[in-house]
Amino acid sequence: MSIVGLVSVVCPSGGIKKRYFSKGLDNFQGFRSSECLGIQLQVPVPFYSGIRQSPRATSLQVVCKDCPRPELEGAVNFLEAAQLSASFRSSPRPEKGLEVVVVGAGLAGLSTAKYLADAGHKPILLESRDVLGGKIAAWKDKDGDWYETGLHIFFGAYPNVQNLFGELGINDRLQWKEHSMIFAMPNKPGEFSRFDFPEVLPAPLNGIWAILRNNEMLTWPEKVRFAIGLLPAMVGGQAYVEAQDGLTVTEWMRRQGVPDRVNDEVFIAMSKALNFINPDELSMQCILIALNRFLQEKHGSKMAFLDGNPPERLCMPIVDHIQSLGGRAQLNSRLQKIELNPDGTVKHFVLGNGNIITGDAYVVAAPVDILKLLLPQEWREIPYFQKLDKLVGVPVINVHIWFDRKLKNTYDHLLFTRSPLLSVYADMSVTCKEYYDPNRSMLELVFAPAEEWISRSDSEIIERTMKELAKLFPDEIAADQSKAKILKYHVVKTPRSVYKTIPDCEPCRPLQRSPIEGFYLAGDYTNQKYLASMEGAVLSGKLCAQSIVQDYELLVRRSKKASTAEMTVV
C-alpha cells in the first residue's frame, strides 16, 4: 500500500513552505509538478556524517497498547528476502570496493547504498534536499511537531522492508496494530465496519473468515459473486494476474460479473489507498497483487506504524550503517546534469553548485518524473528510456490537523474513510509514540484523488477536509469549528508521487540495469513485483545493488579504461 508522498511544496526561492493556521491569512502557494521538480533547497548542512541522533530519537519512552510483532520469519517471501540480503554480506570481498554514486536518498537510494556497502563497496549517496527519506521525508515545525509527506503503513507482506528493520536492529520501532481493516460507514455517520483476521487460522482462511464475518458492507449474494469473479485469479496464478494489466479495476469487475456495490463498498477505498486513484483508472493487476499478498500470507495484511518521524527513526539508521562501512551521504546535492563520454556512457555527474562527482558506477534513484528531466538528449531515443514516458507520478496531498481536544470516535489503527476526497487517516496522537498526546488529537489524512485540488489554496483544502471529517465525527467535529477547533495544520502537496498504475504500464517499467554500461536505476517504478510501495522501493534498491555486484569485473575494466584514457589525454 502506497500511503506515501514525495515532495512538499517549495517556495520559488527554494525553501519549504511551512503551513500554520491563522484566521484571515492564507497566502501559501500550490505548484504544478514542473515548478517543484529539481528545485534545490538551500540549507547550510552539507553532510550527514556530522549529525547524530538525539537521545530522544534513540529512546521513545511513551508506552502504547501495541500488539506483539507477528511471526514473519517462516513466510516464504520473508525467507527469500533474507536470502537476497545475505548474498551481499557473503559475496567475495572486492580487492578495491567500487565507488558508486547514488542520486536520491529515498528508500530506493538508501537501500541501494546499504546493500552495496554490505557487499564491500563505497556508495556516495546524494540527496537534493535537506532531509533524508524522499517519499517518506518529514519536517519539524516551529513548535517541535513533525509533519510528513504521507501516512506510512508497514505491512507484514513487506518482506524486504521487514528484513531491513531486522538487519538494522530496529524491529522494536514498528508499532504493530491488531489484525483488522476498519472502514467508515458513509451512510451511518460516525460508525465503522471491521474485517477482523483471527490469529488462530492460517492464510487464506483467516482472510476468508474476516470477509464472511462482515455483513455490514457486503451481502451474502455479493460475496458469492465476488468470490466467483476471483476464481480465475486463484486458478490462473501469476500468469493470470499479469494478463490483467490491460484492464482497469472497474472493467475487470464488470467482465467478471462482480456487483457494482463491491466496487463502491470496498475497491474505491482500496484503490485510493494503493495508488491514490479511483478504480476506473487503476490497473486490476495492482489489486490482484495486493490481494494475493494479503490473502496468501497469514500476517500479510497486518499493519504497523513507525514509532516516530521516518528520517530519524528509519532513514538515519540506514545512513549510520552505510557510513560505518565506508560509504557517505551528502545532503543539498542536487544532480544538475549527466555528462557523457563520446561513447554515450556516463563521464560524471554535475551538481547544482557546479561540483563534479565521478564514480565507477552511477545510479539514479530519484522519482521517474525527475529522471525524465535529467536524461541526456543522446539517450532519449533508446527504447529503454522512451518507455518511461508512460510512467507519470500521481498527485497526492497529506493533511495534518491538530485539534484543541482529544477525539473519542477513533481507533489506535489506520482507518479507511470511504469518502470521495479522503483516502485513509489515523489519529497519530494515539497510534505513534513520538506523536503521543493525552489531551489533543492530531489527525493525519491522505487527500486523494488530488489532481483537481493540488493547485488550490490550503484554506480550501482544510475547509473541504473539515466537511468530510464532520461526517466521520458528527458528535465532535463541525465544518464551522463550532465543536472541535483547529489549533494549527500543515498541508503537504505532492504534485508527482508514486507512478500512476494505470493499464499497460507494466511493460514500460525498466530493469535496474540500463543498456548504458555503468548506469543503473532504482525506484518503485522499476521492474519488481511489489509495484508502487515502500516495499517496492526497498526491493528495487536490492536488485539494483545486485546488478552492480554482478557487473563488478566489467565496471573495474571500465574504470581502468577511463583512467588510461585520461592519462593519455594529459
UniProtKB/Swiss-Prot annotation:
It is found in: Plastid, Chloroplast; Plastid, Chromoplast; Membrane. GO terms for biological process: carotenoid biosynthetic process. The keyword Oxidoreductase applies. Substrate binds at R293, A532. FAD binds at residues 104-120, 127-128, 135, 152-153, 158, 524, 534. It holds the Pfam family Amino_oxidase. It comes from the Eukaryota. Homotetramer. PANTHER family: 15-CIS-PHYTOENE DESATURASE, CHLOROPLASTIC_CHROMOPLASTIC (PTHR42923:SF45), PROTOPORPHYRINOGEN OXIDASE (PTHR42923). Keywords: Carotenoid biosynthesis, Chloroplast, Chromoplast, FAD, Flavoprotein, Membrane, Oxidoreductase, Plastid, Transit peptide. This is 15-cis-phytoene desaturase, chloroplastic/chromoplastic.
